[in-house]
Regions:
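Pyridoxal 5′-phosphate
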Residues: 1-244
Length: 244
């Protein structure tokens, strides 16, 4: 039998056996809707909030600042679209780089059809963005800088603390896609001046179809999905308890 060597963990990881064991009871035993008031629903709600607390603690956030999503792509869509529609038309300018994940670049291209102005910054031969280029690109119409933390193709780890400091000084929101870097490099939303952070599970030996968006308390953002009012009325839809 040929032995398989897997080198594509940057794309997705195998679900860890311990994770599978932890998930199983929530398919067949504690299968309730976390919004239900009966015993099984309350237990599902308890584990939902326990998971939210663990994620929040891992990035030094408050528990109420974590919104669960269906993955990193949805979280990126939520961050960019939600902020655009809550700031437009007073502000319509976003700064990003040319080497972002497709779920940033294609959202930016779509937002351009809705009235957004996007600056796509170049990077150097190692994939780093120049802080001065960000600074020079900020205008009175800029409301967001979105730059990936750890690049999904070449592995460059941006200096998000320096970028966050600049954005805070300029009163511009800063979003980073940390799907590739989460659990691999430290994320401290306060120290690094992060306003929104995208996370997901399937890059860290968890299941596909689940992610999260950190949204700093006080930020005004247009809801991503309307319905039953789940996730602080920002992302309606019954939560994926086994995945979360």
């Amino acid at each position: 039998m040929r032995k398989r060597v897997y080198f594509d963990n940057a794309s997705t990881t195998k679900v860890d056996e311990k994770v599978v064991r932890e998930m199983l009871p929530y398919f067949s035993e504690i299968f309730g809707n976390a919004s239900s008031q009966h015993d099984i629903g309350i237990k599902a709600k308890d584990v939902l909030e326990r998971s939210r607390r663990i994620i929040a603690k891992s990035i030094k956030a408050n528990i109420g600042e974590i919104i669960f999503t269906s993955g990193g792509t949805e979280a990126n869509n939520f961050a960019l679209k939600g902020l655009f529609f809550s700031n437009y038309p007073q502000k319509n300018h976003i700064i990003t780089t040319k080497i972002e994940h497709d779920s940033i670049l294609n959202v930016c291209r779509w937002l351009e059809t809705q009235g957004a102005k996007i600056t796509y910054l170049d990077v150097d031969e190692e994939g780093f963005v120049d802080i001065e280029d960000i600074k020079k690109s900020i205008t009175d119409k800029t409301f967001l800088v979105s730059i990936i933390n750890g690049n999904n193709e070449i592995g460059t780890i941006q200096d998000i603390e320096a970028i966050g400091k600049l954005c805070r000084e300029k009163n511009v929101l800063f979003h980073t896609d940390a799907c590739q870097s989460f659990t691999k490099v430290p994320i401290n939303v306060g120290k690094q001046n992060l306003d929104l952070v995208t996370l997901n599970a399937h890059k860290i030996y968890g299941p596909k179809g689940v992610g999260a968006l950190y949204i700093r308390d006080g930020i005004q953002i247009t809801p991503f999905a309307h319905g039953g009012g789940h996730e602080k009325k920002l992302r309606s839809g019954t939560e994926n308890i086994p995945g979360i």
